[in-house]
Amino acid sequence: MNCLTDCDGSCCKIKKSVRAGLKEEGYTMYRSEAHFSRALLSVLNLRVPFVQRIESGVTGSGIPDIWLRWVPAEMWVELKNDSYVSINDAYWKIKWRKGQQAWAQDYRISCGRITYTIVAMRDGFIIVPMNKRYINNLVYQHDVWRVTKLQDVLSILKDESIKINFN
């Protein structure tokens, strides 16, 4: 569900006037991570040969939400939704749960590959490469890609999948 087109305001704390202004400017906002996930999966399923949503009650602590497979590349992606912040903010405090950054670092060290966190914000998306530990979960503009369209998220992930070290 897109908070700008399908929401009456009861699902979130975003003022109707703010929501209307963002909609007018062409931004997309999601009321939950699940709604963001569905929208992203609808784009990924059209362009990525294999996409698997992993998150469930039985997966281990820290495992990302989605696994993508391009031949010969593969990629793990964690999803977050924070409609109270902007892609133009100077920095963001990402709501990683305990173990998520540790899992990403263990995977990077053992497999030589980077996982990514995609955060849906009120006016776009940031893509965070998990190539280091972010102290206090703080991420700065120079650490991320900032985009306003889901299709651009896919383009960046695809470009990054080519750079992955398979040794």
Question: How should each PLM-predicted stretch be described?
Answer:
Residues I66-L68, P72-Y84:
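Conserved catalytic cores of phosphodiester-cleaving nucleases, focusing on short active-site segments
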Residues D89-T117:
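Short, charged, amphipathic alpha-helix that recurs within catalytic cores of restriction-modification
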Residues I127-K149:
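Short, electropositive alpha-helical surface patch
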Residues G62:
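Beta-rich catalytic cores
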Residues G9:
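Cysteine-rich micro-motifs
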Residues R108-I135:
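Nucleic-acid nuclease catalytic cores
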Residues K16, L22-K23, D143-N167:
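Charged phosphate-binding loop/patch that engages nucleotide di/tri-phosphates or the phosphate backbone
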Residues C3, C12, K16-V58:
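Acidic-basic catalytic patches of nuclease active cores, encompassing PD-(D/E)XK
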